[in-house]
């Protein structure tokens, strides 16, 4: 972007917003030109919203000149894995695996940042599921974190905690099945909720009139919250009873489904999560097999763009 500087108190300062008085009213300047060698050259363009970037692996980004805010359309911690089912030899029952939990989330929140600072985006991995077994624990999802070299911590979205099945044996006792736990959201920065900015096409909008501030997964501006636990069917009663695995916890306040339950019916393993949702758990006494494995949790993400809020 073209930059324009003025000298103020012996120091050069970059111009981020400029106005001209026209017919007794102040109008914001959108573009400025200067004639150089007989040709008009651009020396100023008002800052407009950048395009969205989706970060799916840990990295850094520099806040561009002129920007003073980041719009996080979607961010979520990693979902936890699903627990595999367990089958027994005349122990009086069978065990289903708990579904994984989703990570905490942010949907359409705007935070202040400083131009030129480095933002670190840490993306939480999805947790691994387990095979079938009598003492197994699904892996947790990783934390998704946004922080700035000047701004400091902006948010930490904890990943889901995996469930478990413990204390069982092939001829009994039946194992104890513990549920997964949704990740917790820690919002360190205060979200911005008012002001005006320019969309990428140059249109001037306010927070109330913008149509791009509620297009995240939740569909409502300024939302954040904790993740959701998967279901935990537990044990069924009777030798060779059939039981389906748990369903993974949905992410983004129920707007992204969790992984599907492992069979029966059918002999599929627990389904994988997506976009921070929990994985499905495995079932027991499925057709053609004894029990099935849990799936992998959905990885985290941060989808963002930069704005200049006035």
Question: Which residues make up each language-model segment?
Answer:
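Disulfide-bonded cysteine-rich modules in secreted/extracellular proteins
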Residues: 4, 20, 47-55, 170-183, ...
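Glycine-rich strand-loop-strand elements at beta-sheet edges
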Residues: 54-60, 74-147, 163-178, 236, ...
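A short, compositionally biased
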Residues: 1-2, 14-15, 27-30, 136-145, ...
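Surface-exposed ligand/attachment interfaces on beta-rich extracellular proteins
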Residues: 52-67, 145, 149-150, 183-187
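Acidic, glycine-rich loop-and-strand cores that form catalytic or ligand-binding grooves
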Residues: 151-153, 158-269
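Intrinsically disordered, compositionally biased repeat/linker segments
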Residues: 1-45
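Aromatic-lined ligand-binding clefts that engage carbohydrates, nucleic acids, or primary amines
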Residues: 70-72
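Surface-exposed loop/edge segments in extracytoplasmic proteins
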Residues: 27-28, 41-43, 48-50, 82-83, ...
């Amino acid at each position: 972007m073209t930059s324009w500087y003025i000298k103020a108190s012996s120091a050069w300062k970059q111009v981020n917003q400029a106005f001209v008085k026209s017919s007794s009213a102040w109008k914001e300047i959108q573009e400025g030109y200067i004639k150089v060698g007989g040709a008009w050259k651009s020396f100023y363009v008002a800052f407009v919203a950048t395009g969205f970037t989706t970060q799916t692996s840990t990295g850094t980004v520099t806040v561009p000149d002129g920007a003073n805010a980041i719009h996080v359309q979607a961010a979520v911690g990693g979902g936890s894995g699903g627990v595999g089912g367990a089958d027994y030899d005349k122990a009086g029952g069978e065990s289903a695996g708990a579904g994984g939990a989703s990570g905490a989330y942010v949907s359409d929140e705007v935070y202040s940042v400083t131009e030129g600072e480095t933002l670190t985006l840490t993306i939480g991995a999805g947790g691994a599921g387990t095979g079938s077994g009598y003492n197994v624990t699904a892996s947790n999802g990783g934390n998704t974190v946004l922080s700035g070299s000047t701004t400091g911590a902006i948010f930490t979205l904890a990943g889901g905690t995996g469930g478990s099945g413990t204390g069982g044996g092939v001829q009994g006792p039946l194992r104890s099945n513990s549920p997964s736990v949704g990740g917790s959201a820690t919002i360190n920065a205060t979200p911005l909720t008012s002001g005006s900015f320019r969309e990428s096409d140059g249109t001037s909008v306010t927070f109330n009139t913008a149509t791009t501030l509620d297009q995240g997964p939740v569909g409502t501006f300024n939302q954040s919250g904790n993740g959701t636990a998967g279901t935990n069917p537990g044990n069924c009663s009777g030798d060779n009873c059939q039981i389906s695995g748990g369903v993974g916890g949905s992410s983004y306040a129920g707007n992204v489904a969790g992984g599907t339950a492992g069979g029966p019916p059918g002999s599929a393993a627990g389904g994988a999560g997506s976009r921070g949702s929990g994985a499905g758990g495995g079932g027991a006494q499925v057709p053609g097999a004894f029990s099935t494995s849990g799936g992998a949790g959905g990885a985290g993400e941060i989808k963002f763009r930069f704005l200049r809020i006035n």
